[in-house]
Structures are given as structure tokens and as C-alpha cells.
């Protein structure tokens, strides 16, 4: 009897979203004989229609459920009968990863779902499994399963009908028990959606099947770091004789807040009131964020701040607890307490239908991670419009930085009162600070109204009275009704603007969020599909950020450039730990994109920039686990590429790193007035007597990583995606951390429109980022897919790594470092000889496996 890695649903995995529904194991076969494993890379079109003659699974669970019926689970009522019986639902799974889940139908042995799924897949498997389960207050029970062989699906024909629901003995779980379903596989190469590139001219529909549609018209400003001083980066020339303009993110935010007349809405993982957005030398007039918001609220502007409530920080009866994550949420709340600025500390709460265990996990481990600033701004004819900032920058300490990313030189100037380095114990007097690299954006156009809608949905949920507060009759009226304010341009008006300007953008807003964090999702789960939401168990999910990444990667024709704080996923295809539950498709999609291009003998390259290690002590258990998952992800991708090279006989001519490379950022800084520490006219600063070993090493080597906090991707120089979401399960599942992102392109600057490489704002942005990281620009960088460019960038990054790791301290002009692992010609990823641990701080670079089932690090 074959053992199928697909089915006892783990309690720790919530939701039922595609590539986010967790792992399941069923210890019985759903087919007789051995089946061939096939790679399914494309989409599955699935209908789960109905089941007939299901068993009554409710015994003890039935009686317990009756006692706990007041807990209120969102279900669809089934048979109108006093009989208490099973509460069935169906999960759809491949390679052990749940890719779809129906809603629960209460008290029915003949449920009718008629639920549709259109699911992207990139899995190697012998079967697609449909598991029929009985939902209970405490977990669920498997009734039986149906297996559809992938070999049959590869024929391309639709498979449909009534299929026996088999139990562990290989027989129907009850006489006549059947599941009505329909399933058809369409391979990637036959899907027109992915053949035309990412920004396919004026007719592009964006990412289909998402909560927010593609909005046409408007402007986008792209930012690298919180600030860029004029003249510090090389010039980048765009089409039409335009020179790329480097935005000043925090200064633009400060200006937008100052000029607001009606509303300022802010969301953050952390918002810290003493932060100074504008830092010009010797300018005492530039106040703090908190002071600025108070002034605006006194002017009559509605100022609402929605911040994650860190459960480990408390302020009770004068006793204060800082909190593990140092978000300063309680401090910010206290600062605004007696002002007209309204601050809501919003806990990450589990859904109504979640078990106690699941609710505890959600509230303790997961966060509200969105970072947005929404304001009204000047529009034509003396009216106002909505403008929104979206990206990776929280308005808190440690985030202000420039492309120079200093370690020591700004401790008494730009970073006075803003010292941040949580990786080891050090001080603002000694340093080094942790340099911070991030990506952000400003949306001026109809898509900004979707960012506003997200804020309103979250605020209404967070401000909903709880407990004794429910007795109050008044409802929250903090949100402005902009549809009742004539001088504010509405969404329909903003969308109908005829914008033929060649510099205009098409923009779409994406999220990772579920119905426990927003108000406005339908109450009836049957309506979920119509709103492009996915069903979890007793919850509705928007996981459109994941959908946006998959669509953009599949549509890529030339190259992918990613900067992200984390990079792990597609664990279903790892060589071990396949059941981890990091089921997002992004790493596998990139690897398969490269493999397909190799088979087609077409140029393609992927560049991925990540931090040297996740923030914190690199020797600690959580960070060692994350590094281990990252290593498994890299290994899987390189092995996939190597197999493609072997398949077409190019493995002696090329190696996997000719197509895929990982980088990190780092810098070192000699003392002022010196050339290097070995050739110094004066003695370098010495650590104080109480310095710890890591601090002593860092002060001696005068080096540190530049922390990559970015969450962005550029595809083919025509499409950009920027937001708050990391490339890990926490950010992409939709039932874990809440996230928001924007994806956009300029239709007049696309390959489809121009017939050649576009040189619009996105090209300028990517080149500007490369100029920051490499210290200069070359003409070859304009074509990242070319082998010469791939090898040149890798060569420069290897030289930079050697300079970073050397004993001699020298000033670094380039910051892009080859990620310090060795990748051989067969795609095997191992420790770099002589550099198994991180310089100065230690910790294995490829991480350590610790056998502990948890969701914190994935």
C-alpha cells in the first residue's frame, strides 16, 4: 500500500488558500498499483460539485459540538432536518500541499458546493487528492479521499464525474459515498495570459481574479531608501531625453502630510512618534512625525493611525514592558493620548471559527505588517484627490538611510537619536549602526483609492466594539465619508479621467489578509468566489500578492530582479523537509522559468538580493532555522536549473550560476582621515572596556551588512511590484501576517508597445538600484539577461565579498556582495571554503536544522 504525503491536517496550519492551506497526510492509498510522477506546471481548473451518501461522523464530537454551538462557526446550512450529522468540506491537495478548500456545509450527508478553483501549480506528483472531511469545533476528521492520477491530467482532457470516496481499507467510506468533481490541467505554454510579457500594452488586464482590479491612469513615484541626496548617484537616461529623477521618500511623505487638508491615515507594523522625516543639516525647524501629526489634527485634518499591537508590550498601571519586537506601540499610543490624533493598537486576532490553539498562534506569532500613508492632495479645479504611499518602510527608528549606507560617520549627525542595531549589543557612541536598504512607492491615481479602501476595511474591523463595549449604541464615525465630501474626487471620477499621457501608469493593489482583519468581506462563504476571495476553514482570504508574483514571473520574458528580506518557499519540492508547509510557489516558479528558457535556448537571468542574515543574532536558533530553509530553497532552485542544462546537453558549456545568482549587501568604512587600517596616519577608535566579543570584532573590522528590508521585484524593466510582503509563508499565505503591495507598469514603456527594450521609469529605477549597489554603471547593465552581464555582475560581487572579508580594512565603493555560499557546476550549494560562518558575529551561513515543528520561521 502506497503512503501518500497528503493528509492529516496539521492544527498549526490555518486557512485554506491556494498554496497556503498547510500540509495534510492520509495514511492510505487512493489508487491501486504504482503511479507515475508528473510535473504539473500551469493551472488546474477545478469544480468541487457535490457529495452523496456521506457517513455521519458525529459521535462524541456531535455532543461536544452541541455544547459549544454558541461559538458560532461560519457555515452554510445544509439539509433542513433536526438530525445532527456531519459538517463536510473538501480540501484539494498536490504534493502534500493544500491548494484549495471548500466552505463547510453544516449538517449534511448530501452537500452541494458547486465551488470553482483556478489554481496555479508547479508541483511534481502522482495524484491530485480530494479529501472529504468533517469539520468539528476541535479539528476535523477524514471521511475519505479521491485521487486523480496526474498522468491522466497531462492528456489535457477534462476529467469529471462521480468518484467513490475511499477510506483506509481502499473501499468506499460508506456504501454509495461519492464525490462529484471536475478537473482539467492546462500547461503553462498553452496559456495565452503568460505569453505576452508582463506589461502587455493598453489591453492588459493585470492580474485576473483579484479583489482589487487593475486601475488605469495616474502616476507612480518609485523610491530607493528613505532618502537620496542630489548628485550622489550616477545619471540614468530614459527614452525621450528624460533623466531619471531619484525620489526623496520621507521628504515627499512629510510634504504630503503638511499639505493634507482633509485626512491623514497611517498603517504600520511600527510607527514611532519621535522619528524625523526630514533631516537637513542644522535645520531646527524640522520637527518630529508626532509633532507634525498633532499640528495637522489641530488644523482640523482627520488623523488616524493604525498600528500593530505587539502582544509582548504592555502599559498597565504605570508599569511598562518594551516588547520583544521593540515596535514602541505603547509609547506612540501614550504620546497621542490627549490629542485629536486617533491611534488604534490593533492585535493580530484569529477568526471567529478558529480553534483556541489556532487563535493563540495567530495572536502570538503573526503581525499586522502593512505600511501605508494615505492623504488628500491638491487636484484640478481647486478640488482634492487621494494619494497613497505603499512599501517596506515603517515610520520608525532605524529606517532612515541613504544609498551611501554609513556605519559610523553619521552617528552624531543624521542618525543622532536614531541608532539601531539589534544584531548584537553595542551603543550609539561606538557603533556600528545597522545600515538599512528599502523600497517604497507613491501612487497618485485611481489605485490610491484601493489603498484607502484597505485602510477603511481594517479600521472598521479594529474599531468594532468588543466585550462590554458592545453595549454602547454609537458606532465608530472616525472615518471620513469621502463620497459625502464634494471637493474630494471620488474613485469613479478618478477612474474615468482620460489619460493619454505616455508617462501614465496602470496600477493594481494586492494584499495578504483574511476576514478576521477586515470588515466588508461577505458573510456568506458562497459569495467568496464572486469577490475573488478564497475559502479557508471558517475564514475568507485575499492572497493576491502571491497571485501577483506568480503571474509576473510566469509572464517574464527576459529577466527577474528581486530584493527581499526573506527568500524561502516551495518546500514541497525540496529534497527533504517537504512537509514544512512553506508552500508558496515563487522559488519554484523562478526555477522553472529559467529551466524552460534553457530548453528553448533563450536568454534569461534572475538576480536575487537578500540580507546577509535575517535581523538578530545569526547564531540564534530561529535565525539558524530560517537560514537552513533558505539554503534548502536555493538548493532546490539550482538543482532544477542543472537538470534542464543536462537535459539539453549544455551542462558542460554553462553552469546554474550563469542563470541564477543570490547576493547580499555589505560595507566597511575606514576611520575619517585614513586610507586603510593597515596604512593609517592615526590610531583607529578603540572599543570601550565593557564591549562584547561581537562588538570588539565589528569595531576592529569596521564592517557590517547593509540590511536588505526591501520587498520588491522588477521584471523585464517593464513591471514593478513593491510592498510590505516578504517571500515566505508568513507574508504570502493570507492567514498569517497582513500585507499590502502595488504592482504597476507604464503601458507606453512595455516590450509589447515598443517592440524593443523599454527605457521608462521602471528601467531607470532598476538601473538606479544597481548604481547604488555596484557604485557605478556600465552599458552592459542595461541588458541583464545577457550572459556577459550575469558574469560581470557576479565577478564584481565576488571582488566586493573578498574586500569585505579581508583582514585589511579599506573603503568600499560597491556594496553588492556575492552571497557567501559555494554553488558547484551541478547545482550543489554548500559552505564557502574557509568561510563557513558569518564574519565577526558567527553563525553557520547555510543554517542548522532543528527538528521543531513551528510556524514562526517560515
Swiss-Prot record:
This enzyme's EC code(s): 3.1.4.4
Source species: Arabidopsis thaliana
Deleted gene: phenotype: Increased tolerance to aluminum.
Annotated compartments: Cytoplasm; Membrane
Residues reported to bind Ca(2+): 225, 405, 437, 772
PROSITE patterns in UniProt: C2, PLD
Active site: 369, 371, 376, 709, 711, 716
Biological process according to GO: embryo development ending in seed dormancy; innate immune response; lipid catabolic process; membrane lipid metabolic process; phosphatidylcholine metabolic process; response to aluminum ion; response to oxidative stress
Family the UniProt entry places it in: Belongs to the phospholipase D family. C2-PLD subfamily.
Induction: Activated by wounding, heavy metal, methyl salicylate, osmotic and salt stresses. Up-regulated by aluminum stress.
Record's keyword annotation contains Acyltransferase: no
Origin: domain of life: Eukaryota
Tissue: Highly expressed in roots and flowers, moderately in stems, leaves and seedlings and low in siliques. Not detected in seeds.
Name of this chain's protein: Phospholipase D gamma 1
Catalytic activity reported: a 1,2-diacyl-sn-glycero-3-phosphocholine + H2O = a 1,2-diacyl-sn-glycero-3-phosphate + choline + H(+)
Topology of this chain in the membrane: Peripheral membrane protein
Pfam family, one: C2
Annotated cofactor note: Ca(2+). Requires micromolar level (PIP2-dependent).
pH dependence: Optimum pH is 5.5 to 8.5.
Activity regulation annotation text: Inhibited by neomycin. Up-regulated by PIP2 binding.
Amino acid at each position: 500500500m502506497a503512503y501518500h504525503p497528503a493528509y492529516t491536517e496539521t492544527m498549526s496550519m490555518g486557512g485554506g488558500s491556494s498554496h497556503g492551506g498547510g500540509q495534510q497526510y492520509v495514511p492510505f492509498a487512493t489508487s491501486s498499483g504504482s503511479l507515475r510522477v508528473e510535473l504539473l506546471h500551469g493551472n488546474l481548473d477545478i469544480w468541487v460539485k457535490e457529495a452523496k451518501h456521506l457517513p455521519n461522523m458525529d459521535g462524541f464530537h456531535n455532543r461536544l459540538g452541541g455544547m459549544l454551538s454558541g461559538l458560532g462557526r461560519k457555515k452554510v446550512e445544509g439539509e433542513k432536518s433536526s438530525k445532527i450529522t456531519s459538517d463536510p468540506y473538501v480540501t484539494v491537495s498536490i504534493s502534500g500541499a493544500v491548494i484549495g478548500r471548500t466552505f463547510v456545509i453544516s449538517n449534511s450527508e448530501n452537500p452541494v458546493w458547486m465551488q470553482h478553483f483556478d489554481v496555479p501549480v508547479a508541483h511534481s506528483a502522482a495524484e491530485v487528492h480530494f479529501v472529504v472531511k468533517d469539520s468539528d469545533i476541535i479539528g476535523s476528521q477524514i471521511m475519505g479521499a479521491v485521487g486523480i492520477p496526474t498522468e491522466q491530467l497531462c492528456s489535457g482532457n477534462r476529467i469529471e464525474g462521480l468518484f467513490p470516496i475511499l477510506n483506509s481499507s481502499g473501499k468506499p467510506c460508506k456504501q454509495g459515498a461519492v464525490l462529484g468533481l471536475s478537473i482539467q490541467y492546462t500547461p503553462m505554454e498553452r496559456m495565452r495570459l503568460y505569453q505576452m510579457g508582463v506589461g502587455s500594452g493598453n489591453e492588459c488586464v493585470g492580474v485576473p481574479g483579484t479583489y482589487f482590479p487593475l486601475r488605469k491612469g495616474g502616476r507612480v513615484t518609485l523610491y530607493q531608501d528613505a532618502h537620496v541626496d542630489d548628485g550622489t548617484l550616477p545619471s540614468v537616461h530614459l527614452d525621450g531625453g528624460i533623466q531619471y529623477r531619484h525620489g526623496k521618500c520621507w521628504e515627499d511623505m512629510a510634504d504630503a502630510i503638511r499639505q493634507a487638508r482633509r485626512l491623514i491615515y497611517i498603517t504600520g507594523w511600527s510607527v514611532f512618534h519621535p522619528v524625523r522625516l526630514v533631516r537637513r543639516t542644522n535645520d531646527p525647524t524640522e520637527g518630529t512625525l508626532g509633532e507634525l501629526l498633532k499640528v495637522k489634527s489641530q488644523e482640523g485634518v482627520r488623523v488616524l493611525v493604525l498600528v500593530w499591537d505587539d502582544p509582548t508590550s504592555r502599559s498597565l498601571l504605570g508599569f511598562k514592558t518594551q516588547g520583544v519586537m521593540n515596535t514602541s506601540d505603547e509609547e506612540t499610543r501614550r504620546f497621542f493620548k490627549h490629542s485629536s490624533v486617533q491611534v488604534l493598537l490593533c492585535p493580530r486576532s484569529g477568526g471567529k471559527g478558529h480553534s483556541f490553539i489556532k487563535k493563540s498562534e495567530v495572536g502570538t506569532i503573526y503581525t499586522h505588517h502593512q505600511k501605508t500613508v494615505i492623504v488628500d492632495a491638491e487636484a484640478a479645479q481647486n478640488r482634492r484627490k487621494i494619494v497613497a504611499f505603499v512599501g517596506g518602510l515603517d515610520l520608525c527608528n532605524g529606517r532612515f538611510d541613504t544609498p551611501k549606507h554609513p556605519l559610523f560617520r553619521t552617528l552624531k549627525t543624521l542618525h543622532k537619536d536614531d541608532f539601531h542595531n539589534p544584531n548584537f549589543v553595542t551603543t550609539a557612541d561606538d557603533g556600528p549602526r545597522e545600515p538599512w536598504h528599502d523600497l517604497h512607492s507613491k501612487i497618485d491615481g485611481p489605485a490610491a483609492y484601493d489603498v484607502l479602501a484597505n485602510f477603511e476595511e481594517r479600521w472598521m474591523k479594529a474599531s468594532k466594539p468588543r466585550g462590554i463595549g458592545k453595549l454602547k449604541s454609537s458606532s465608530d464615525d472616525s472615518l471620513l465619508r469621502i463620497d459625502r465630501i464634494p471637493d474630494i474626487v471620488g474613485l469613479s471620477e478618478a477612474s474615468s479621467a482620460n489619460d493619454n499621457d505616455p508617462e501614465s501608469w496602470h496600477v493594481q493593489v494586492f494584499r495578504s489578509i483574511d476576514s478576521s482583519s477586515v470588515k466588508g468581506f461577505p458573510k456568506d462563504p458562497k459569495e467568496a468566489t464572486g469577490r475573488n476571495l478564497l475559502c479557508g476553514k471558517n475564514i475568507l482570504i485575499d492572497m493576491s500578492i502571491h497571485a501577483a508574483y506568480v503571474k509576473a514571473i510566469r509572464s517574464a520574458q527576459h529577466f527577474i530582479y528581486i530584493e527581499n528580506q526573506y527568500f524561502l518557499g516551495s518546500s514541497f519540492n525540496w529534497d527533504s523537509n517537504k512537509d514544512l508547509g512553506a508552500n508558496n510557489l515563487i522559488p519554484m516558479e523562478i526555477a522553472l522559468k529559467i529551466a524552460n528558457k534553457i530548453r528553448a535556448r533563450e536568454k534569461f537571468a534572475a538576480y536575487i538580493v537578500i540580507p546577509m542574515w535575517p535581523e538578530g543574532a545569526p547564531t540564534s536558533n530561529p535565525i539558524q532555522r530560517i537560514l537552513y530553509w533558505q539554503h534548502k530553497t536555493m538548493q532546490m532552485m539550482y538543482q532544477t536549473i542543472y537538470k534542464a542544462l543536462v537535459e539539453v546537453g549544455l551542462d558542460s558549456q554553462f553552469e546554474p550560476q550563469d542563470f541564477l545568482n543570490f547576493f547580499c549587501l555589505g560595507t566597511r568604512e575606514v576611520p575619517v582621515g585614513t586610507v586603510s587600517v593597515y596604512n593609517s596616519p592615526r590610531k583607529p577608535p578603540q572599543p570601550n572596556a565593557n564591549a562584547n566579543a561581537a562588538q570588539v570584532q565589528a569595531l576592529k573590522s569596521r564592517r557590517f551588512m547593509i540590511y536588505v528590508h526591501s520587498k520588491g521585484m522588477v521584471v523585464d524593466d517593464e513591471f514593478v511590484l513593491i510592498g510590505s510582503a516578504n517571500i515566505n509563508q508568513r507574508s504570502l499565505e493570507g492567514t498569517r501576517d497582513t500585507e499590502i503591495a502595488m504592482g504597476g507598469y507604464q503601458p507606453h514603456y512595455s516590450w509589447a508597445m515598443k517592440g524593443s527594450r523599454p527605457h521608462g521609469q521602471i528601467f531607470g529605477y532598476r538601473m538606479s538600484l544597481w548604481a547604488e549597489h555596484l557604485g557605478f554603471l556600465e552599458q552592459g547593465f542595461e541588458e541583464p539577461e545577457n550572459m556577459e552581464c550575469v558574469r560581470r555582475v557576479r565577478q564584481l560581487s565576488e571582488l566586493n565579498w573578498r574586500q569585505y572579508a579581508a583582514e585589511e580594512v579599506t573603503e568600499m565603493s560597491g556594496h553588492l556582495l556575492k552571497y557567501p555560499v559555494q554553488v558547484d557546476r551541478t547545482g550543489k550549494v554548500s559552505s564557502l571554503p574557509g568561510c563557513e560562518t558569518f564574519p565577526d558575529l558567527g553563525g553557520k551561513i547555510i543554517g542548522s536544522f532543528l527538528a521543531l515543528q513551528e510556524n514562526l520561521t517560515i
